[in-house]
Amino acid sequence: MAKPIRVLLYYKYVPIENAEQFAADHLAFCKSIGLKGRILVADEGINGTVSGDYETTQKYMDYVHSLPGMEDLWFKIDEEEEQAFKKMFVRYKKEIVHLGLEDNNFDSDINPLETTGAYLSPKEFKDALLDEDTVVLDTRNDYEYDLGHFRGAIRPDIRNFRELPQWVRDHKEEFMDKRVVVYCTGGVRCEKFSGWLVREGYKDVGQLHGGIVTYGKDPEVQGELWDGKLYVFDERIAVDVNHVDPIVVGKDWFDGTPCERYVNCGNPFCNRRILTSEENEDKYLRGCSHECRVHPRNRYVSENDLSQEEVVSRLAAIGESLDVTPA
C-alpha cells in the first residue's frame, strides 16, 4: 500500500531568465497548493526537495514540467508516512551549487551544460566501486560521509562542499593519472564538480547519474556496496539505501558505539552535526566539546530548563566543571 506523503528530490541546470522574479512566482504557486519544502533558484537552474500528498506533488510536477526548459526535469520520488518539511521556502541564490573557486569570480564557474563528467548508471558505478584502479571520491560533507558512504570511497577532510576543490588540489598527485568517479546525494553537486575535474586536467572522470538516491532504488544493484544510511536535508535526516546487506557505520561522537542518530551541537555558534544516542546527548548536554557544553547559549540547557545546579551535576559526572577545561 502506498504511503500518504511523497518527497520529491530534483534539480536541473537550465538558464532561467529573471531568476529572482521566477523564485517569487514559484514560492507563490507552492504556497497556493500547500506544498512544503526548500528550493534554490539561480540564473543557472533550480534545485529542490519538496513534500506533500499525492495530489499536491502531482500538481507541482505538472507545473514544473510546463515551465520553459523544464519539460524533461527528473523527479526522484520517495514515499513516506509524514511530511519531510514544516514550511515552504524558495530562495534566489547566485548559484544552486557553490564550488568556492578561489577567485570568487562567478564568470569562471563551471557550467555543467558545457563541461561535466561522464554519466554512470548504477550498474556501471557498482563496477567502478569494484575496480581497484578507479578512485571513488565522495563529494559530500564530512558528517554526511560519516553516517553512510560507498564501500572503499575516499573521505575528503572537508566540512562543506566549497572546500573540496582545494582538497583535491592538495592531493592531486595521489590520483591525477587514475580514473576518478564521484558521487553525491542526488547528482547536483557532481554535475558541477566533475566538470571542474575535467577542467583541471583529469582525463577520465565519471559521475553517478541521479546520485545515491537513484542507486538505492535501482532494481538491479539494490543499493549494494553502500554502508550505513544516507543523510538527507529534511526532517527525515537519514534514509536507507542498501537493501541487500545493510550495516551501521556511524559512530557515536562521545563513545564510538554504533549510532545513526544526528543532532546539532547545543552551542549555536558551533552547530556541528554529531552522531549520538539520546543517553549521551543528555549526559554531555548536547555539547560536542567542553567549551560547547558550558557555553552560556547552550540550547540543550535552555530547551530543558536546566538549573545551574543540574548543569554542574552533569558536568561533574563526566569529570568536568563550569570553569575548568579538561586537559
UniProtKB/Swiss-Prot annotation:
It catalyses: uridine(34) in tRNA + AH2 + O2 = 5-hydroxyuridine(34) in tRNA + A + H2O. InterPro entries: Rhodanese-like_dom, Rhodanese-like_dom_sf, Rhodanese_C, TrhO, TRHO_N. Its EC number is 1.14.-.-. Residues 130-224 form the Rhodanese domain. Pfam families: Rhodanese, Rhodanese_C, UPF0176_N. The active site is at 184 (cysteine persulfide intermediate). GO terms for biological process: tRNA modification. Keywords: Oxidoreductase, tRNA processing. Catalyzes oxygen-dependent 5-hydroxyuridine (ho5U) modification at position 34 in tRNAs. This is tRNA uridine(34) hydroxylase. It comes from Streptococcus thermophilus (strain ATCC BAA-491 / LMD-9). The gene is trhO.
